[in-house]
């Protein structure tokens, strides 16, 4: 994992994953509430809608994606992994989501998968076979989802799409450590 600051926003990323991505930090946004620091990307943490959407635009620009392509469903601490498409772009931020899950998978370019974590573990997987066949998977892995085998569920989806274990790269983002318990 490496850290980068782009357009005033600091984020972590993995050089192993060759799609635009980032694991946000709290650095670089416009939030003013003390408990959110500056880059709050959640509607339920005390910032107004416009502040969260401005932070989203800043983060998206920093990592090189269109903020309207981001999907972010309510998370339920499960092992549910949902396949999503361009029709789902913007769900959770710009239109009602209509579903809840803790993981997404897509084979379509221009779809950005967003999970929110605090103590839980963000996991990003990219599967690639040849120059055209690609899938991306993002997971919110808390202890409940991990116990329910969310990573195994995601790998099962990737295998069902025809990818082999050697086609898949994964990055584990920043999360809470045992020192905090």
Positions of PLM-derived features:
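Active-site microenvironment for binding and transforming phosphate-containing groups
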Residues: 1-181
């Amino acid at each position: 994992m490496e850290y980068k600051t782009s357009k005033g926003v600091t984020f972590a990323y993995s050089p192993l994953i060759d799609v635009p991505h980032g694991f946000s930090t709290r650095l670089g946004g416009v939030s003013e509430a003390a408990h959110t620091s500056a880059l709050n990307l959640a509607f339920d943490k005390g910032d107004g809608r416009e502040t969260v959407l401005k932070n989203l635009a800043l983060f998206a620009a920093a990592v090189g994606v269109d903020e309207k392509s981001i999907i972010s469903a309510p998370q339920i601490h499960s092992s549910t992994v949902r396949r999503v498409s361009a029709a789902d772009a913007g769900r959770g931020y710009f239109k009602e989501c209509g579903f809840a899950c803790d993981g997404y998978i897509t084979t379509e370019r221009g779809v950005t998968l967003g999970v929110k974590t605090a103590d839980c573990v963000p996991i990003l997987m990219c599967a690639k076979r040849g120059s055209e066949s690609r899938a991306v998977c993002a997971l919110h892995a808390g202890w409940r989802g991990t116990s329910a085998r969310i990573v195994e569920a995601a790998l099962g989806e990737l295998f069902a799409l025809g990818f082999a274990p050697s086609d898949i790269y994964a990055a584990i983002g920043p999360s809470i450590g045992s020192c905090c318990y």
